[in-house]
């Protein structure tokens, strides 16, 4: 008897009897009466509908409002609930997580299990959701055939009843559970009841770094199949060595009653037909009866067949050119009449590891990947098509070509969209035991083998027809045990067309075809006990190691992070066996919550009263929860771009462009170039880009650099745009860019200016004399008393405090322009990377923030050591020395020289000396609180988005203008943000600053950022806070739990000097 023919127990068990077995605490019981896994079915009854992928009348959705009752434990559910709704039941949408609808609370933890660790036991207080709904069926469904119910995702375990009769049980939150309802259905109204448990023994295998939520969170539908029907379909493509021909191999199995399986008259009367379509063109077709060749001495399979179609000159599938065919598999009866048809998108592509390289269609691929959780700020883990498509389009637009389904099989629609739009996918089993000690405790326990096994094998059986899936993953962070080795072999036997990866046990066990470490660094070894992480350059050179290395996680993008990302891409392009990786991760996993006034905000761990929790560690995304970009997304886009540029010469001006596309011509690209002087274009042009895959071409842009009529920095900007829209991008989408600083040509005033100067020279001389006389009348004035030193020029007055030595006021027409004095600044509001794993209950002394705290950086006591004034012939100079100490230990010394001239300018030279005992400071700079609030900020420097010394590959030097509010990056957990580096001019209202500096400008002070837990709690302060840095430490980002700022980006010198010129335009 096949599994499809298993009938329910003849004696129906009562609800208390069923619950008393506590199946949810038995790892060897993962299901009762659940049907075998298979690819998604639609059961079309005509070929054209299957070929065109029309909605199938044989499917009926059960999404919508269900009746819902909540209990704190399953034993509290009244027995009569399985037959009728309870009086207190309320409507609840399906799909949804019940925690987002007022029941129970979501819990965020990373490693720690949210329940006491006592596998397979779970707490007696086990939140339980009771769902029910009524439905009616077409009479034809009841007259013949089989009706199934399919739950695409239920967390974490559930029991099912139909019309008061128990149907079955299932666990594994991320794979479909399918049951035959046929014996329980009746004419008219039918009632489905589902009891969902929050915790089960399966929860010990689902310890992923994510929100822990419950409920029916994916689609529910009914499917009607004929009595004799297609049971499984496996599609594979095999390409010739030259990729000029292919075999399409289809293995199809038919459900036939077991008593008829050995009757050749029965089995031989059914035929299977495969038709391959390219759009509306029939490319190939083959039909043959059921049955295979003899498998062993007992003979062949009689309920399945293998069909092989040869295709000449197939159009190949890749992420760059995702060409899809459509295979329609039809089951025919002895009269050649269609019984049913199933259809799948087919991509002809080959995945292989050859000579130490992962290759797609014979070409070594560079994985531009990202890890993605299924997450939406409003709906949690219930994701609709619009959200899925939004993620894919954003990934494609920002030069991603791969995604890892971290850490579980995704919604079935995700793979279809990846097939269609072109993304390589790592499909990962729903297994993580990170909170076990050791992690391999369960994977080495035979009693858990079946639970592990089903999560891998059922994933493969559901998803293996998708061309986008190029790698299978055995799960995440579960150590390494005998179970992994066994499942690795199972996959290699059942699907020899794809490699397998698994990071557990050190990323280099026999259970992985790919070295897939997480957070290994480019040049730095991390010799952890048992599982060392070598530098990626070193790893590929270890003895007897020939596998490709693809980081399964790297570049931890938590908050203001992602520093040093460009270093990885320099290594990837330098060493062929370093084939990229998957950034952690795509989206900030924050949930929409509401404060006491009903106002929404983005919440993280602990905001729902959830314990235990790991606070803001859920927010590691390249995009905010609403999918608006973090600045780090642009850095990824630029580093991963498919075109690389080099400047060959400046006279003539020639550049070289290399295409890193493996398969597509650059037939929709236009090259734009501009020569920029101080942010203004002086020469520009454009031309079509015609590059073959993996080719380079030189482009002659100009015969010589333009003659300049004013001094300044000269830059060459190039960018590539797509003139026409594509399925994933709008017209004029910018896909790549680069910038070079050009050598400075001689400054040659224009002839018009020269002639005008000669003609008007006498008048100019007279004007200059008048201007000099006016300057004498409005010379710099100096006033001193016991409390202040004042320097006055026309309507401006600079006031110094003799006590602090600071510029404590800048008067303009008797109006104060400073709310806080101009002073040194050496600290920043800690980044997540600065904090590391330090929390209130656990202090990591190695974290930057702890080192700064211990050294007293946040409690510095300032003293004015000296204050000198010199009134020179054309200026006033004030020299001040400041000492900073903690607990009477001198830590920093700064020497400021202020020069005031007769143009109303204040130029400050700052020299800072750092004690050798002090940890490297976060910044060397100054800050003040301006009284002004101007709507716009303009600057000449790197922009337009936020950038830091170790994250500025994507930023470009130019003249930028943004609204003030956009100068603050609204990270959900407030921290240092908004810096713009390598600035030469800053204009804010009437203020102008010049020099070579970094700056940040905002309505929020560093102090407020330091003490505020959430972005929505920040309160705009009076005026504007201006931070000017001569030097700023990098942000780091190789990971977020250990110091990861590279030594080149740490302020390790003992002395620093910078200069800033301030001016207020009266």
Swiss-Prot record:
SMART domains per UniProt: Bgal_small_N
Q: Which PROSITE patterns match?
A: GLYCOSYL_HYDROL_F2_1 (PS00719), GLYCOSYL_HYDROL_F2_2 (PS00608)
Q: Name one GO cellular component term.
A: beta-galactosidase complex
Q: Which UniProt keywords apply?
A: Glycosidase, Hydrolase, Magnesium, Metal-binding, Sodium
The UniProt record gives the binding positions of Mg(2+) 1 as: 432, 434, 477
Cofactor names = Mg(2+); Na(+)
EC numbers listed for it are 3.2.1.23
Q: What class of enzyme is it?
A: hydrolase
User: Which sites bind substrate?
Assistant: 110, 209, 477, 553-556, 620, 1041
UniProt: Na(+) binding residues: 209, 617, 620
Reactions catalysed = Hydrolysis of terminal non-reducing beta-D-galactose residues in beta-D-galactosides
Biological process terms from the Gene Ontology for this record are: lactose catabolic process
Family, as annotated: Belongs to the glycosyl hydrolase 2 family.
Q: How does it assemble?
A: Homotetramer.
The record's listing under NCBIfam families reads:
PRK09525.1
- The entry's protein name is Beta-galactosidase
Q: What is the species of this protein?
A: Yersinia pseudotuberculosis serotype O:3 (strain YPIII)
Q: What is the lineage of its organism?
A: Bacteria, Pseudomonadati, Pseudomonadota, Gammaproteobacteria, Enterobacterales
């Amino acid at each position: 008897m096949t599994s499809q023919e298993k009938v329910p127990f003849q004696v129906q068990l009562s609800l208390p009897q069923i619950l008393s077995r506590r199946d949810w605490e038995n790892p060897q019981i993962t299901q009762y009466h659940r049907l075998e896994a298979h690819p998604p079915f639609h059961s079309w009854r005509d070929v054209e509908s299957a070929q065109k992928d029309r909605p199938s009348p044989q499917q009926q959705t059960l999404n919508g409002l269900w009746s819902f009752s909540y209990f704190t434990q399953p034993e509290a559910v009244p027995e009569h609930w399985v037959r009728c709704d309870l009086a207190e039941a309320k409507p609840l949408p399906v799909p949804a997580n019940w925690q987002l609808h007022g029941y129970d609370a979501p819990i965020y933890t990373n490693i720690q299990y949210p329940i006491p660790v006592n596998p397979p036991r779970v707490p007696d207080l086990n939140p339980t959701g009771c769902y029910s709904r009524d439905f009616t069926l077409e009479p034809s469904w009841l007259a013949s055939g089989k009706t199934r119910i399919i739950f695409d995702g239920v967390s974490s375990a559930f029991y099912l009843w139909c019309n008061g009769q128990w149907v079955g049980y299932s666990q594994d939150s991320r794979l479909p559970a399918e049951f035959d309802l046929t014996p329980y259905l009746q004419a008219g109204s039918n009632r489905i009841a589902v009891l969902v448990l929050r915790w089960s023994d399966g929860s010990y295998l689902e310890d992923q770094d994510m929100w822990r939520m419950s409920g029916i969170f994916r689609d529910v539908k009914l499917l009607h199949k004929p009595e004799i029907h297609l049971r499984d379909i496996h599609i594979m493509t095999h390409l010739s060595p030259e990729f000029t021909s292919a075999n399409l191999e289809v293995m199809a199995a038919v459900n036939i009653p077991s008593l008829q399986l050995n009757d050749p008259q029965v089995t031989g009367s059914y035929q299977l037909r495969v038709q391959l379509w390219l759009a509306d063109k029939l490319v190939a077709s083959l039909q043959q009866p059921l049955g295979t060749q003899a498998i062993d001495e007992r003979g062949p399979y009689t309920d399945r067949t293998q069909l092989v179609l040869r295709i000449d000159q197939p159009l190949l599938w890749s992420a760059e050119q995702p060409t899809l065919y459509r295979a329609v598999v039809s089951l025919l009866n002895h009269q050649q009449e269609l019984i049913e048809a199933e259809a799948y998108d087919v991509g002809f592509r080959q995945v292989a590891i050859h000579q130490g390289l992962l290759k797609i269609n014979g070409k070594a691929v560079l994985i531009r990947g990202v890890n993605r959780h299924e997450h939406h700020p409003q709906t949690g883990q219930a994701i609709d098509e619009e959200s899925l498509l939004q993620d894919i389009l954003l990934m494609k637009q920002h030069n991603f070509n791969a995604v890892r389904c971290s850490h579980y099989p995704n919604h079935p629609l995700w793979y279809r969209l990846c097939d269609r739009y072109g993304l390589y996918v790592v499909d990962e089993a729903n297994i993580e035991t990170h909170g076990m000690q050791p992690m391999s405790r369960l994977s080495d326990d035979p009693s858990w083998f079946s639970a592990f096994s089903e999560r891998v094998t059922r994933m493969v059986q559901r998803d293996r027809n998708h061309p986008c899936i190029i790698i299978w993953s055995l799960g995440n962070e579960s150590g390494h045990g005998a179970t992994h080795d066994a499942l690795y072999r199972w996959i290699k036997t059942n699907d020899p067309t794809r490699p397998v990866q698994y990071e557990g046990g050190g990323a280099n066990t026999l259970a992985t075809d790919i070295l897939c470490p997480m957070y290994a660094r480019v040049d730095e070894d991390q010799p952890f006990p048992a599982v060392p992480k070598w530098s990626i350059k070193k790893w590929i050179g270890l003895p007897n190691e020939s596998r490709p290395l693809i980081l399964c996680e790297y570049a931890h993008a938590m908050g203001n992070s992602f520093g040093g990302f460009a270093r990885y891409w320099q290594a990837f392009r330098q060493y062929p066996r370093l084939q990229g990786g998957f950034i952690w991760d795509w989206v900030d996993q924050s949930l929409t919550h509401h404060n006491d006034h009903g106002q929404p905000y983005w919440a993280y761990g602990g905001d729902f009263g959830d314990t235990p929790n790991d606070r803001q560690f859920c927010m590691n995304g390249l995009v905010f929860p609403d999918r608006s970009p973090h600045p780090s997304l642009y850095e990824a886009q630029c580093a991963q771009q498919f075109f690389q540029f080099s400047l060959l010469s400046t006279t003539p001006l020639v550049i070289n462009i290399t295409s890193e596309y493996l398969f597509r011509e650059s037939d929709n690209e236009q090259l734009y170039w501009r020569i920029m002087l101080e942010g203004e274009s002086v020469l520009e042009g454009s031309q079509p880009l015609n590059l073959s895959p993996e080719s380079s071409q030189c482009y002659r842009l100009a015969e010589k650099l333009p003659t300049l009529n004013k001094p300044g920095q000269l830059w060459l900007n190039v960018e590539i745009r797509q003139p026409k829209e594509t399925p994933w991008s709008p017209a004029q989408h910018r896909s790549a860019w680069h910038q070079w600083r050009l050598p400075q040509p001689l400054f040659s005033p224009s002839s018009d200016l020269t002639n005008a100067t000669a003609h008007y020279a006498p008048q100019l001389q007279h004007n200059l004399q008048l201007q000099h006389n006016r300057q004498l009348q409005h010379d710099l004035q100096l006033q001193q008393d016991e409390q202040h030193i004042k320097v006055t020029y026309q309507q401006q007055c600079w006031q110094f405090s003799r006590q602090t030595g600071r510029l404590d006021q800048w008067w303009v027409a008797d109006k104060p322009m400073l709310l806080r004095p101009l002073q040194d600044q050496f600290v920043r509001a800690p980044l997540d990377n600065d904090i590391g794993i330090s929390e209130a209950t656990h202090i990591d002394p190695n974290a930057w923030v702890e080192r700064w705290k211990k050294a007293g950086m946040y409690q510095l006591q300032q003293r004015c050591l000296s204050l000198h004034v010199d009134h020179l012939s054309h200026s006033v100079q004030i020299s001040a020395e400041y000492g900073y100490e903690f607990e009477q230990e001198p830590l920093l010394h700064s020497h400021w020289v202020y020069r005031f001239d007769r143009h109303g300018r204040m130029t400050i030279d700052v020299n800072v000396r750092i004690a050798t005992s002090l940890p490297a400071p976060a910044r060397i700079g100054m800050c003040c609180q301006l009284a002004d609030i101007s709507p716009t900020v303009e600057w000449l420097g790197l922009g337009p988005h936020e950038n830091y010394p170790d994250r500025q590959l994507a930023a470009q030097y130019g003249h930028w203008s943004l609204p003030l509010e956009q100068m603050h990056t609204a990270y959900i957990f407030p921290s240092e943000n908004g810096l713009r580096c390598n600035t030469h001019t800053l204009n804010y209202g009437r203020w102008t600053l010049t020099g070579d500096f970094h700056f940040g400008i905002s309505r929020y002070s560093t102090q407020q950022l330091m003490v505020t837990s959430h972005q929505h709690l920040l309160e705009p302060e009076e005026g504007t806070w201006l931070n000017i840095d001569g030097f700023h430490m990098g942000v780091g980002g190789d990971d977020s739990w250990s110091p990861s700022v590279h030594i080149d980006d740490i302020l390790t010198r003992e002395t620093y000097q910078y200069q800033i010129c301030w001016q207020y335009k009266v």
